[in-house]
Regions:
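Iron-sulfur cluster-binding electron-transfer modules in prokaryotic oxidoreductases
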Residues: 1-182
Length: 183
């Protein structure tokens, strides 16, 4: 299975440490190799991008350049980190002027953004690389009879690739335990 640069982000490092721990352990069980991104920084997942978009993209580009240096695609479990990283990666790749400005700033850290990696949410890796059968094969305690109403947040589907329906994404619903209950 592929190895990924793991970007936990500030929230998972401090407040949501249990989500961080479960993401790492689940990846191990499913055979997904995660290597924490070296010297990562905050992705600016606040309203900061509305204050200075160039600086906000530069913050993210520094992490992307670190992942490129390691030769690994990046994976983020935090939906805000994923959204910011995904869009920054996309826009910097598409805009030569933006890329030039960002690379000028990254020179200070002896880094360069080349646009050679992709950014994934960890659920995307589980659903599309490990797959339903791969997950089923690792289940130790089936959740028979348990109903789960999961909440993923809206940010995870904002940059969805492919034909997935943004209003009703189905890749979340691969487990038998999820249900559609009024919460």
């Amino acid at each position: 299975m592929k190895k990924y640069a793991y970007f936990p982000g500030c929230s998972l490092e401090k407040v949501a440490w249990s989500y961080n721990d479960s993401s790492i352990e689940t990846a191990k069980i499913l055979g997904v190799e995660l290597q924490e991104l070296a010297d990562w920084n905050c992705c600016g997942a606040t309203a900061y991008s509305h204050v200075d978009q160039l600086l906000a993209y530069t913050l993210v580009a520094r992490n992307l350049a670190q992942a490129e240096k390691e030769g690994l695609d990046m994976v983020a479990p935090c939906s805000a980190c994923y959204k910011n990283s995904y869009f920054a990666n996309k826009y910097i790749k598409e805009d030569a002027d933006l890329s030039e400005h960002i690379n000028y700033a990254l020179e200070e850290d002896d880094l360069q953004f080349n646009g050679s990696i992709d950014v994934h949410h960890i659920i995307d890796i589980y659903a599309n690389e490990v797959g339903v059968e791969g997950i089923k094969a690792k289940v130790k305690k089936p959740l028979e009879g348990l109903k789960v109403a999961a909440y993923y947040g809206c940010q995870i589907v904002r940059p969805r690739k492919g034909a997935e329906d943004l209003e009703d994404p189905q890749f979340f619903e691969i487990g038998r335990a999820s249900c559609r209950e009024r919460v």
